Amino acid sequence: MPKYYCDYCDTFLTHDSPSVRKTHNGGRKHKDNVRMFYQKWMEDQAQKLVDQTARAFATNRMQGAVPRTTMGMAPVPPVGHHPMMGGPPGMPMMAPRPFPGPGVGFPGAPGMPPFPGGPMGMAGPPGMPPMMPRPPQQFRPM
C-alpha cells in the first residue's frame, strides 16, 4: 500500500487515505510546520529583494550613473525662487491663492455659461505676476 509523504512535516503517514490525510492536515504540528514554512519563504523573498536593491544601488554608484529619476526632467530652480509665485529673484513672493478662481473656460453656477476672461491688460506681460497691468500700448488710427 502506498504511503503519503508530507513535505511540511518531513514524515510519511501510515497510509494514503483521505481520512488519514485530513486528520494529519488538521493537526497542530502540521499547521505549525506549514506556518513556519511560509514564514521562512517570505523572509527569504524579502532578503532577495533587499539584496537585489543593494546590488543595483551599488552598481549605479560605482559606474557613476545618474539616477533615472533625474533623466529628462527640468533642472531644479535655485533655492528661494519659485517661478510659479512670479516676480524676479530676490523680490518678495506673493502667497498662492487657496482656490483657483473662475477664469476663462471655468463654468459658473450650474446652468450658467462659462465666465469670460478678465479685463484686457490684467494678464500681465510674460515674466510678470498675473493681475499686473500691462504698459500702455500705442494705437495707430487706420
From Swiss-Prot:
Its main location: nucleus. One of its GO terms (molecular function) is zinc ion binding. Component of the spliceosomal U1 snRNP, which is essential for recognition of the pre-mRNA 5' splice-site and the subsequent assembly of the spliceosome. U1-C is directly involved in initial 5' splice-site recognition for both constitutive and regulated alternative splicing. The interaction with the 5' splice-site seems to precede base-pairing between the pre-mRNA and the U1 snRNA. Stimulates commitment or early (E) complex formation by stabilizing the base pairing of the 5' end of the U1 snRNA and the 5' splice-site region. Belongs to the U1 small nuclear ribonucleoprotein C family. It is found in: Nucleus. Keywords: Metal-binding, Nucleus, Ribonucleoprotein, RNA-binding, Zinc, Zinc-finger. This is U1 small nuclear ribonucleoprotein C. It comes from Caenorhabditis elegans.
